[in-house]
Design a protein with these regions (language model features):
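Short, surface-exposed, polar/charged, turn-prone segments marking secondary-structure boundaries
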Residues: 52-55, 90-95, 180, 216-221
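Serine-dependent carboxylesterase/thioesterase catalytic core
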Residues: 25-33, 37-45, 113-224
């Protein structure tokens, strides 16, 4: 924040130190076409609401995870070939369904010739690398490597991605990363239109992620029935 003070004989500019962050918030989008700035509206509205309630929105450090560009090229290439090769009707519906279902299929589908099992696909690894880079950026830049309570906000399929990412961090933690980057400061998991239950039907035993971390002093669980 910059304050300008005029003493009558000239203008002096004072740069105030940045306010320390008290909460970190990671936002990830769901299925369908998205833009890199998908989270801007959410951040602006939440910040405005915090201000209305008498809280300084500057104490929240925000970071978004954009991954649509990883899966989009293959889907767009297929649609282009399909539309050029046949006079297909209902193109808007076809495109919508392919983008929605294609994200889920491309995230975990094994490449041809690979054995079925616990192996991750290249897309799975690339998307998780995008999450890892976002968490690292959040920790090292706005937080200045100072851990604070960590909340994730996920829409639709983004909740499934983050759940898998947290699971991997808990089962195969990277000892070179900080406790914050290993998701040990996770204090809240907020989802919108979460479809995680759909991905449990193939499991003989559903084992959830450990949440909250034993180091968290308090947790609040809430579900909206609407």
């Amino acid at each position: 924040m910059i304050n300008i003070w005029d003493n009558g004989g000239g203008r002096k500019i004072f740069v105030q130190p940045r306010m320390k962050k008290e909460l970190a918030c990671l936002v990830i989008h769901g299925i369908g076409r998205q833009k890199p700035d998908f989270a801007d509206g959410l951040v602006a509205r939440v910040s405005a609401q915090l201000h209305t309630l008498g809280h300084d929105p500057e104490v929240v450090a925000w970071q978004s995870v954009y991954w649509d560009d990883i899966l989009r090229p293959a889907q767009d290439a297929y649609l282009k070939a399909a539309y050029q090769g046949a006079d297909l009707n209902a193109r808007a519906v076809r495109t919508l369904l392919l983008h929605a279902l294609g994200d889920a299929a491309g995230y975990r589908q094994l490449p041809s010739g690979r054995r079925r099992g616990g192996e991750e696909t290249m897309s799975y690894r690339r998307i998780h690398e995008r999450v890892r880079d976002a968490v690292r950026s959040l920790y090292r830049e706005p937080l200045a490597s100072r851990p604070v309570p960590f909340v994730v906000v996920a829409h639709s399929f983004g909740g499934h991605i983050l759940s898998n990412y947290i699971w991997d961090c808990q089962r195969r933690p990277d000892k070179r990363s900080s406790s914050f980057e290993r998701m040990n400061w996770l204090s809240g998991f907020i989802t919108f239109g979460c479809n995680i239950p759909l991905f449990t039907f193939a499991c003989t035993e559903v084992v959830p992620i450990r949440f909250p971390h034993p180091g968290c002093r308090r947790t609040l669980s809430a579900m909206h029935a609407g």
